[in-house]
């Protein structure tokens, strides 16, 4: 095999208005290397993968794979044939084997014809069996079922045109992995995957013999899979040998050598690095420490000391002892039971991470908590002092023609944030929109910038209990870190739907896990502690992802 599978020489990319999004990148990729791509939103990460996939040829320099190298590319919005079923879409990846199996059946049938050319049939049979044997084709159904379970695909006979965006991405990812290319280019492969499916994907890619280049903000994924980090910083591609934790160490040392302009960013990195260095036992005590610090977080003096946060969550009124109590809750849609007899109590100071497969009913629980929907039976009781602030996952309901400042402020110079007033430009700046960035049109923002804007709009009510539905989607690692730090220092409670395990390990004091047939489990501890508990009580198989089973309403 060649020393490198892919080479880039002085690659640059200019986007309007004459901005060098990538410049002078020269890289060579080793066979079998696992590379995680990091960079702020808008740094050119997706552009880099499109160039490597051969889809963007309007570039400076040269980017090419070695002859004979098969490249597989997963874009953020993959294209599938809308007329196909899920099964037909997946079988496209193994069409050679599917066709060989089909033809082999026909060959067997032809042996029954006494006038057949048996020598010719035997030769064809041998060729077909060679193809099938090379791909373990006789176990094809088992392979497909295993992959479909691991990525929680919809039913085999579901039409692609009826699938959600997340379901289509999972089908496209499954198809790509089954193709077994020499080099995988993955743009946010963990998006729309629950935590168990991400863990399965980690193991798959760790054992994958080819080269992997993945854009992802899932830091456990980067820790467990990546042997290199490629950082895109102001157009340059900087390779770092090691995984994410190693990159944090190296990055901290590099920032220490740079000027004080990076001081705030370095402080945020050091907070996360301190958590990384603590080890499992230290991390597990973090959630308990948060509960103990609740009164300090509530103090006015602490809030004043904390005004330099990169991302600001406005504090609400002081929270009393009673927060949220759920008793014997049941909720169904059609003939599917989403929640069956759920009871739990959210203690003061808690941050509850909500996990489970897509479509299990996590967002439905939020809508019931906020009164938008009613349960079939049971109760949700909010404490008298509770003021909710909800952030949904739908970021499209923004006016693309407005500037960032206009979208948040409504044109007002002074905004009411909770029970206080503050200059609108100062408030918008607390969400990392500084100076000229406040004049950007909403339609020009990256996915991560839209996420920050969405938070700024919906958090201004100043709640003391936050309902955050997938707040980490599309955020770059810098913003994720800032959100984690802001939540840890927020003087209230939060319930957060997320599949980001690193995020959940850093912030969660409790886990609410949606399982099969309407069962939901409430656990005190963070995500890793919960996984250890499941493995200890139910065995290792409990951590393997499976397609969700819905309990049916008895007729």
Indicate where each model-derived feature is located:
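ABC ATP-binding cassette signature C-motif
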Residues: 1-263, 307, 313-555
């Amino acid at each position: 095999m060649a020393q490198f599978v892919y080479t880039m020489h002085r690659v640059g990319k200019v986007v309007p208005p004459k901005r060098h999004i990538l410049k002078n990148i020269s890289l060579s990729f080793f066979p079998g290397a696992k590379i995680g791509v990091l960079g702020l939103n808008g740094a050119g990460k997706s552009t880099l993968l499109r160039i490597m996939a051969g889809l963007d040829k309007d570039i400076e320099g040269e980017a090419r794979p070695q002859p004979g190298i098969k490249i597989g590319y997963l874009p953020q919005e993959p294209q599938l044939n809308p007329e196909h079923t899920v099964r037909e879409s997946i079988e496209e990846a193994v069409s050679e084997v599917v066709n060989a199996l089909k033809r082999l059946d026909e060959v067997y049938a032809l042996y029954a014809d006494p006038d057949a050319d048996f020598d010719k049939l035997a030769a064809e049979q041998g060729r077909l069996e060679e193809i099938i044997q090379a791909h373990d084709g006789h176990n094809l159904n088992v392979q497909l079922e295993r992959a479909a379970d691991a990525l929680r695909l919809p039913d085999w006979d579901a039409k692609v045109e009826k699938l959600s965006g997340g379901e289509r991405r999972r089908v496209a990812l499954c198809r790509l992995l089954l193709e077994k290319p020499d080099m995988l280019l993955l743009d946010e492969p963990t998006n729309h995957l629950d935590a168990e499916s991400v863990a399965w994907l980690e193991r798959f890619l760790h054992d994958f013999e080819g080269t992997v280049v993945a854009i992802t903000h899932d830091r456990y994924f980067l820790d467990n899979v990546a042997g290199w980090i490629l950082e895109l910083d102001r157009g340059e591609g900087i390779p770092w040998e090691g995984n994410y934790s190693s990159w944090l160490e190296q990055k901290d040392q590099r920032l220490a050598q740079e000027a004080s302009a990076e001081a705030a960013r370095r402080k945020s990195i050091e907070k996360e690095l301190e958590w990384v260095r603590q080890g499992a036992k230290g991390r597990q005590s973090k959630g308990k420490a948060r509960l103990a610090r609740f009164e300090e977080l509530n103090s006015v003096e602490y809030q004043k000391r904390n005004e330099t946060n990169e991302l600001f969550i406005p504090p609400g009124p002081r929270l009393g002892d009673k927060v949220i109590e759920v008793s014997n809750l049941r909720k169904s849609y059609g003939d599917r039971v989403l929640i069956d007899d759920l009871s739990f109590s959210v203690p003061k100071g808690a941050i509850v991470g909500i996990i489970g497969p897509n479509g299990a009913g996590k967002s439905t629980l939020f809508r019931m908590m906020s009164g938008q929907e009613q349960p079939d039976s049971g109760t949700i009781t909010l404490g008298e002092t509770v003021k909710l602030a909800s952030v949904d996952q739908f970021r499209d309901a923004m006016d693309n023609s407005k500037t960032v400042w206009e979208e948040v402020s409504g044109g007002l110079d002074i905004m009411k944030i909770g029970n206080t007033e503050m200059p609108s430009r100062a408030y918008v700046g607390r969400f990392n929109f500084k100076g000229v960035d406040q004049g950007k049109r909403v339609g020009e923002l990256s996915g991560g910038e839209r996420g920050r804007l969405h938070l700024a709009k919906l958090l201004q009510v100043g709640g003391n209990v936050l309902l955050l539905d997938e707040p980490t989607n599309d955020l770059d690692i810098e913003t994720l870190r800032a959100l984690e730090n802001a939540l840890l220092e927020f003087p209230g409670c939060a319930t957060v739907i997320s599949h980001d395990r690193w995020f959940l390990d850093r912030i969660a004091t409790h886990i609410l896990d949606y399982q099969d047939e309407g069962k939901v489990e409430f656990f005190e501890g963070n995500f890793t502690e919960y996984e250890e508990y499941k493995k200890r009580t139910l065995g290792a198989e409990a951590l393997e992802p499976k397609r969700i089973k819905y309990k049916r309403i008895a007729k």
